[in-house]
Amino acid sequence: LAELMAGFTAQGMSEDEAKAKAEAASPLMQEAREMLVKWEAGDPEVRGLWEMMNNWVYAGFDETYKKMGVSFDKIYYESNTYLEGKEKVMEGLEKGFFFKKEDGSVWADLTAEGLDHKLLLRGDGTSVYMTQDIGTAKLRFADYPIDKMIYVVGNEQNYHFQVLSILLDKLGFEWGKSLVHFSYGMVELPEGKMKSREGTVVDADDLMEEMISTAKETSQELGKLDGLTQEEADDIARIVGLGALKYFILKVDARKNMTFNPKESIDFNGNTGPFIQYTYARIQSVLRKAAESGIVIPEQIPAGIELSEKEEGLIQMVADFAAVVKQAGEDYSPSIIANYTYDLVKEYNQFYHDFSILREENEAVKVFRIALSANVAKVVRLGMGLLGIEVPSRM
């Protein structure tokens, strides 16, 4: 199929035109298209096979998402939205927004926008991805009173979403201009790119298991699991392993390609998830010891306490959290929260090293530093939570 497409593209055809020609000339693709026609017509046998295979896939997805701590408010299946898309395409055809070729296929002429012709319906009447995305977008805006829709999809689909926005606008949907394609870069391993076609793709479940295993091994070597039960140790390994994976990826501007290094991500020093998690656990240890000593943090710290430059800096960093979250939202950049959280714990660790907390003789200063520690921990927990990363109460 790829060779056929390359040949047709060399003849000056657009990518969609070359793909359509290649599919028509490929026996295997012809069989697949025949099945698609039967599927859209509701053929019982084809629908039965499709449902069985989809259930296998959904079960696997659910297992992976659960392990990652990911959930969705609502899932839109293309099989439930393609009819909406076909209806809108036919409306666009009737209004002259689109045109039909001799083979019956429906296309959009986007040359005025500096693009090429885009296939919307095949000659046999079956839908394509663009048709389905038109239908899905329409349903989403109908179901929810949203101002903006963000598609989190790799940068390989930049053209697709540029076209989708234009088509929706042509069809009269004002919100078509408000579609945002959050175009993220690709993740590579030290050995090279992950490509499914070349068999170098890394299974998400295998990667998570590897990260958890590495986290457990590293934590044991550093004595961070000492005194814990087996169940507690396993839970810490899970939290640290998945936290390392998520943080290492999220700390990089998502628009850039990156190399994921499993060993580097587990390091308990530097800009890593485990370093932040360990600092949070350290603060929780301080708070537990303070509580055991009968120290109660007042709702308001008494005025008149002389603060060091380091303490004033920490207070300002904690106060900056809301602005950081706002900026991250405006820029569609979780990395802003990730790196802010790292900078905060780095400053706290320096404070922890340079100043007495529980051993401070001045009672008012001691209570202030404990309260400051508690507020740093709160912000760390909230920041990591926004990144989908758990923080352990002990380590």
Each PLM stretch: what is its role?
Residues 1-395:
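NTP-dependent nucleotidyl-transfer catalytic core
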